[in-house]
Amino acid sequence: MCIRDSHNLSEINYNLEFINSLIYLLKECDKESLGNKESIINNIYRLLSDGMLFEQDTLMQVDTLNKVKQGIIGNNITKVIDKCIYFFSKFQPSHKSETFELFKRRFYEKYEEQEVPLVVALDPQVGIGYGNWTENNGDINPLLQGLPNPFLDRSYKIDMDLTPVTMLLIKKYEEAIKQGLHEIEILDEDLNEFEERDLKLPQCSVMLSVLSNDDTPSILLKGIIGGATSRLISRFEYLDSKIENFVNEINKRDELYYKDCIVAEVMHLPEDRIGNIQMHPNNRQYGICYLSSPTTKYVKKIIPIDDITISVYHGQEVILKSKKNKKRIIPMLSTAHNTKNGLPIYSFLSDYINQESMSYSFDWGSYFHNKSFLPRVIYSNVILKPARWLIHPNEFPQNKNLNSDELYSWKLKQRIPDEILITLGDNQLYINFNKEHLVKIFISELKKKRPIILEEFLYSSKNINLVESQEGFFANELIINLYKK
């Protein structure tokens, strides 16, 4: 990097000058409005380019806070949320982690009711391991290279278990396709045959978008998130003290609900560019530090990883305990970081949080995995899932330049609307087929020769006037926190 070793006074002065210059430019950048930052950002790039290797597109990550003059949603929206919670209590199975369930079974087969140090249980050599790190694939041994290993075979058989929920969806899907319908509706009478379940949600965050905010509101439900419900907004705490106070209130409710346990924040910095997600104020009393230092001043007591033991009660419930404090530990991860490819302990603690309090969103299930078109799903004026198209590369001739007329004919045949979203994980790219430059972007995506998922764009209606400024109306996403009294 461009900061030099501080062997003498001149080097120290150079480092101080560099840091002060960087701080000055960052402050100047904050003062400018969104459209006037380019020259300052270029100066930052030039300053850092002196001996530092970095990706220019990912160097800076920015959060923006716009002061809201007034923010109100009516009781009609909260009533719709109540209906959504009722829907999931009857209809949709919870999103259990297959990795976590497999770990429970393998742990109980090996240790039964024993209480084992967590670092031992998750060690792929002496214990079981976790996720991609197990006793079968945790290490790379040159003596085994070239030998077949079924545990490393990433091909899998899709589970086609035809549950009552799947059977209902098949019936409605086939009716919609036969009649050429763009959506299916799930009715209360459809839910009568399903047993109501406790959703295990002491508190939760509801993610939604308001599509119309009148007497009969229409919303797009993104999901109901359990576990550490502050994870969705914690990275924005530093922007406003009101947000920080709100997150603190959420975290305190966790401690009240688990009053006989230790609620501990997991603190881990797994890789570069994750610091902006992981580093945030935290008012929890306890913290679990894993390959990181306790950088937050708020955590008063640190629980070392080697102080934690694990057991699986009757092969069902995973229990973590502190040997020193002789109490059960409830780990919390108040960030939205994807931990699937993390180290075993970090991935395990994250999955444990999600199993302690479930999350819910509509899922078509594996039976519909490869369908080229899935209609919109609605329940009680709530869009549970937008319409979706799966585009395979072989739908277009290879080595041929696709022109606009051919693309338009294909779009009409597939009944794809003018405005859609290309979705890749959590990322979405807006495409309007009436805009030539956006059509070119769409064609460039097709040339990448990978399957593309398209999703209908739902914000075109003139009724969407929830978020307004001098520039006009905007799309919106709301996060509403709920808790049991």
Question: Where are the regions that the model predicts?
Answer:
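Type-3 copper protein
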Residues: 4-276, 317-323, 420-485
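Long C-terminal appendages of very large multidomain proteins
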Residues: 262, 272-274, 278-302, 306-485
